[in-house]
Amino acid sequence: MAKMMQREITKTTVNVAKMVMVDGEVQVEQLPSETFVGNLTMEQAQWRMKRKYKGEPVQVVSVEPNTEVYELPVEKFLEVATVRVEKDEDQEEQTEAPEEQVAE
């Protein structure tokens, strides 16, 4: 039997609606659901939807997180994975953001 790698992944389905004016009345138009990797809060989902639907009056109706366990044979993982290269400490120091200096 092949060895399997397992990983628990949380995805969040975001249900969003758009406000539209029809005959002088505001109506709600349900938009397609979006799914994101991770456990998003309502605020995070709202921010992402506002970025996607720039300038449109959209509102997140609900967020539905769902966690499932995924598995993959180790051989398949090795076929598609890349080796992670550790950075030297000197390289890390150069890539870090400079610290703010406090005026005395």
From Swiss-Prot:
One annotated GO molecular function: DNA binding
Region span, Disordered: 85-104
Residue spans of biased composition, Acidic residues class: 88-104
Keywords from the UniProt entry: DNA condensation, DNA replication, DNA-binding, Early protein, Repressor, Transcription, Transcription regulation, Viral DNA replication
DNA-binding region as annotated in the record: 1-19
GO biological process, one term: chromosome condensation
GO cellular component, one term: transcription repressor complex
Keyword match Repressor: yes
Pfam family of the protein (one): p6
Family: Belongs to the phi29likevirus histone-like protein p6 family.
Domain notes from UniProt: The N-terminus is involved in DNA-binding.
Name of the protein in question: Histone-like protein p6
Lineage of origin: Viruses, Duplodnaviria, Heunggongvirae, Uroviricota, Caudoviricetes
